[in-house]
Amino acid sequence: MESLTYRAAGVDIDAGDESVRRIVPIARRTLRPEVLGGIGGFASFVRVPSGFTEPVLVSSTDGVGTKLKVAFATDRHDTIGIDLVAMGVNDVLVHGAEPLYFLDYIATARIDPARIEAIVRGVAAGCEQGGCALVGGETAEMPDLYAPGEYDLAGFVVGVAERARIIDGTRVAPGDVVLGLASSGLHSNGYSLARRIVFDVLGLHTDAPFPETGRTVADELLEPTRIYVRPVLAAVRRHAVHAMAHVTGGGITGNLPRVLPEGRRAVIQRSAWDVPAVFRTLQEAGRVAQAEMFRTFNMGIGYLLVVPAAEADAVTATLAAGGEQVVRLGEIVAGERGVELCA
């Protein structure tokens, strides 16, 4: 019997080392002044930024879900990392936190250095958009756990907020206005249903034109999740904001109640915005009920802010100056906590 090696068992340490060699300079470009030391050690060191009286660390972890299946089918891996970062930084942003640093986890059947590099380029691009440093990560090669050519991603983000300025929804009051920021598409939620409709019901291929949009299926489904950090931080630093929500799995109806106190109800005017064509196509082709659409997809609204009525115009102007499409969706009323969709 020949002597066995780790490579013969399916784990290529040399490929892992080559991946690290490629991604370290990419990550280095994202570093903030608060990062102490370099990349590649056993742990990362990040000091809390100056200027805070009582800084609080705010953390979140998330993945990309089955949007990865579209990346596998198209062999396009350069933007999926943006989605990974977006899911985390938009979550800590909800509480008024500035994203500080990010770590990624890539698990795969076989390490392909070029593919790992493409993924991390996307992660770094997302970190640059979100203003946080990519300080480290883990790439795990597990041939007996993942199918050939497939991988999974997870991300972990830490942000910082002034304790006295944490946004937690407790100040939400009747008469407050609900503002919505346009999404870039499906973002990173609802893909199990979307893929079933697009590939099984409609029978489309990834290079086929997507109905109504003029884009390919691949371009439509791989459009990166929008990162709202910079314009939203500008708004919360200048104006009163009572609550915010990142519209992920559960949609508007599932996520907005998470930041509303008892006795507060959001009344959303469905006619306030035009639902993008991608969602209309999915609903019509899949014969999906309206309520199911709104609790599965973002329906064109990726982020929500609840603000005092007197501040609504000023907040809208600040967000618009930052490049956001802002929609006045409705208002807060007294009532059972939840969301009411009106025609």
PLM regions with names:
Residues 1-33:
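N-terminal amphipathic/basic leader segments beginning at the initiator methionine
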Residues 2-8, 19, 115-133, 146-153, ...:
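Glycine-/charge-enriched secondary-structure boundary and capping motifs
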Residues 106-107, 185, 310, 333:
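Short, glycine/serine-rich, charged loops/turns that create anion-binding
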Residues 25-184:
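Glycine-rich phosphate/pyrophosphate-binding loop regions near the starts of catalytic domains
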Residues 52-53, 64-67, 162-165, 186-188, ...:
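Short, acidic Gly/Pro/Ser/Thr-rich loop/turn segments
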Residues 53-59, 63-65, 169, 204-207, ...:
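Acidic-glycine-rich active-site phosphate/pyrophosphate-binding loop
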Residues 152, 165-217, 253:
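Short, acidic (Asp/Glu-rich) active-site segment that either coordinates a divalent metal cofactor
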Residues 12, 62, 175, 246, ...:
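Residue-level signature of catalytic and energy-coupling elements of molecular machines
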